[in-house]
Amino acid sequence: MPQLIPFFFFNQVVFTLISLSFIFFVFSKYILPWIVRLYVSRNQYNSL
């Protein structure tokens, strides 16, 4: 099992951190602002 070999374990940890950082960046920069704008616009439209 390669997960138990320290070199591969370190490689998996680094890859996981990089992947999670990338996903966090994409969500915070692109996905979440789009959802918030949509929510606010619908909320303002319904309050009229």
Curated annotation (Swiss-Prot):
The gene is ATP8. Disulfide bonds: none annotated. It is found in: Mitochondrion membrane. The keyword Ion transport applies. InterPro entries: ATP_synth_su8_fun. One of its GO terms (cellular component) is proton-transporting ATP synthase complex. The keyword Ion transport applies. Its main location: mitochondrion. GO terms for molecular function: proton-transporting ATP synthase activity, rotational mechanism. Mitochondrial membrane ATP synthase (F(1)F(0) ATP synthase or Complex V) produces ATP from ADP in the presence of a proton gradient across the membrane which is generated by electron transport complexes of the respiratory chain. F-type ATPases consist of two structural domains, F(1) - containing the extramembraneous catalytic core and F(0) - containing the membrane proton channel, linked together by a central stalk and a peripheral stalk. During catalysis, ATP synthesis in the catalytic domain of F(1) is coupled via a rotary mechanism of the central stalk subunits to proton translocation. The chain crosses the membrane at residues 13-32. It is a single-pass membrane protein. This is ATP synthase protein 8. F-type ATPases have 2 components, CF(1) - the catalytic core - and CF(0) - the membrane proton channel. It comes from Trichophyton rubrum. Keywords: ATP synthesis, CF(0), Hydrogen ion transport, Ion transport, Membrane, Mitochondrion, Transmembrane, Transmembrane helix, Transport. Belongs to the ATPase protein 8 family.
